[in-house]
Amino acid sequence: MILKVINHDFIYDMKNLCTVFFPWEKINDDGKDNIEVETKAQGNEFFVCARLFDKSISKTHILKENEDAQTEMSVLLYNVLSELTGFKPPWGILFGVRPAKLMHRFADEMGEKAARNYFINTFLATPQKTDLAIEVMHHENKIISLSSHNSFSLYVSIPFCPTRCAYCSFVSHSIEKTHKLLEPYVDLLCKELEKTGQVAKALGLRLETVYFGGGTPTTLSASQLSRLFDVIEKNFDLSTLREYTVEAGRPDTVTEDKLMALKGAGVGRISINPQSFNDEVLDTIGRRHTSKQTIDAFALARKCGFNNINMDLIAGLPKDTLSSFKNSVDTAVSLGAESVTVHTLAMKSAAYMVTRENAYDISDKLLTFDMVEYSNSCLKSSGYYPYYMYRQSKSVGNLENVGWCKDNMDCLYNVYMMDETHSVFAVGAGAVTRLKNQDTGKIERIYNFKYPYEYIDRFDEIIERKKLIEKFYAN
């Protein structure tokens, strides 16, 4: 699509709002395309014109003395694109990742009631989404209050999967192609964990949560997982640990010996992620397992003593219907999962599934909206509450991802990560360490190399960067 920004500096907002309505489109500022948008400021007069194929709409707005120019230009563009497409994004002009955190800031500044009104009347968020942000904020606050000034969390990246799902944009690698990297990767990951633990102990930091993500951590063997757990136990002070999570993820990687290795290491929370309980959908997105395998893996985890199991579902997957999505939610609830995380499909450029097909069709957005609405009502009526939430760009319908849980089954790491409550020391390929200054709120990031082969080939540089953690805390 073509986007022209004339006589104003709000290009970031304009691009993000265009992406809300047309998530599959690449944005340029010249050439020809089926979609053209022009935003223009002339003194206190704002002008927006948009064309979709042979249909065009234009609107103007005269900026009043007490109005914020950036917000009003965004509202004008939102109104034009809503009328042009017939679609009103439920989060209005908001496109940030952390709506609950934003709500928290506004509630602190002006009070919760005024913040709610501001979300609805200024940002054009629906009352339902606004109230969701408020509810999540309240649950998050209880968890955030547990963190201390010197707290931190540990994230362990296992960027390998049995196969790569068609919707996935994460830096994860099929073990069919990278099996030979697994053992050297684990060897070096043990060394990075050892060094990171030494740094954390020397700084006198308090470890709150450990989270193994990926990828699919249970792509590793039971013995490889045990090696990592042993290194963590030997090099980190686990006496303050509140939560230990491993994403088992793909049910086709879940075995009894791996589950017992997790249990023996003190892992208390795992994820077994169906994404869907519709086998046709699973086949379409490249997940080589069946819904029965998910149910069997869940039963095996129960047999091994796990009483805090999360299940991930995705709304908006190809071949999924409202009826089959409802069945997926109902199945997760009937199994008794302690938490259910409902994601909205996000079409990232690195995913195999990205296509312009149906890019202008509102029906996909409305179907996904109905799916999310059903999950919200079903989970709430089944005794779950929303404890954390985040949003992604290019999600279908500009919807959200929400973690729902039963009483006291919140994932602390998810909340700490999304709120940026404290530092997160991250190890492994693609991992990003986030260091938080508790006095200023400033976040500094240290990036590990993205790909396993880079991580292996340039490991000395990874270890050298640990000095940046010491430098940060010395200041």
Q: What do the PLM-derived regions correspond to, one by one?
A:
Residues L84-K88, F106-L154, L203:
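N-terminal [4Fe-4S]-dependent radical SAM core
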Residues P217, K394, G430-T433:
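Short, glycine-/Ser/Thr-/acidic-enriched flexible segments
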Residues V48-A50, V156, I272:
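Short beta-strand motif preference
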Residues Y167, A337, A426-V427:
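Short glycine-/small-residue motifs
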Residues S172-Y374:
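Conserved non-cysteine loop/helix-boundary elements of the Radical SAM core domain that shape
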